[in-house]
Amino acid sequence: MKTITLLIPVYNEESVLPQLFKRLDEFTKNTPNYQFEFLFINDGSTDKSFSIIAEQSKKDSRISYINLSRNFGKEIAMIAGIDHVKSDALVIIDADLQDPPELIQEMISYWEDGYDDIYARRNNRQGETWLKKKTSQWYYRILQKSTNIPIQVDTGDFRLLDRRCIEALQKFRESQRNTKAIFSWIGYKKKEIFYDRDPRLAGQTKWNYRKLLNLAIDGITSFTTAPLRMATIFGFIVSFIAFVWIVYLLVRPLFGVSTGAGYSSLMAVILFLGGVQLLSLGVIGEYVGRIFIETKNRPLYLIEEYHAGNIKKTRR
């Protein structure tokens, strides 16, 4: 019997966990031909999420859990789980039930047809503001334009991955991660399915615009040098315009045209060039900072407690 692990990152989800357990149990009862493991990654929750998971694991032998030593963020929590997956396939799903577990049956069907990465694309994003929807769309399209990788648009982490995709993901050890882009980078045979994303069942979203901005910066700087190239091109254009302007100022007196004091225009040019320089330094600093962090070679995460359920491990 093939084994499938459901990887579920958790951060302060105590209000939704009981309903999640129920939905997962109903799903597995309707999918009897596979052996399932529910691998919960507690990412430093400050509520009762971990104690609820630990208690439920005593009742359900399919539940495994990793309790991280602190909050490392969802990207790191996912790789912590991926590192411990031994099953034939992996499904990544959020704990908030916005992604319906029932859709996994369709993913499994395509997996049996030979697809390696079956990802769910959202028809709609209920419960999200217009601004969040638009900024997400812009981000994916900018990332697509600035890389030579076919980025999957309007998708999250909800997907099924074959064993060889799991082993490929385990090789990525960078600390500044954008897993959604990594899914695209590894390639393999992909299949897109569409679904309507539900609003949160309970609790509040853990994402805010600051976290989304950081994720966007990580994604762009991890997979493309386009910002550096743009800074170079912009610097060349500004330098060329400045050169033409200088030539113009030198030629004007030859035709009897007074140059005038020009303090206002001079200050405007100085401030503009100063802003361009600071922006360029900021872009360079982002890349240098990431190089500095990666060269430290620190562990991506630390585990406080690991509990393995009774699922039969088919890989080593």
Regions picked out by a protein language model, each given a short descriptive name:
Residues M1-G127:
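Structured catalytic core of nucleotide-sugar glycosyltransferases
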Residues Y11-S15, Q98, E102, Q170, ...:
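Residues in soluble alpha-helical coiled-coils and helical-bundle/repeat scaffolds
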Residues N178-R316:
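Hydrophobic helical membrane-anchoring modules
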Residues P9, L68-R70, R159, T232, ...:
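Short conserved micro-motifs on helix faces and helix-strand junctions that flank
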Residues L24, G81, D96, I118, ...:
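Residue-level signature of catalytic and energy-coupling elements of molecular machines
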Residues R62, I66-R70, K74-H84, P100-I182, ...:
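Acceptor/aglycone-binding surface of glycosyltransferases and processive sugar-polymer synthases
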Residues E26, N30, E55, K59, ...:
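Conserved amphipathic alpha-helical interaction elements at protein-protein interfaces in regulatory
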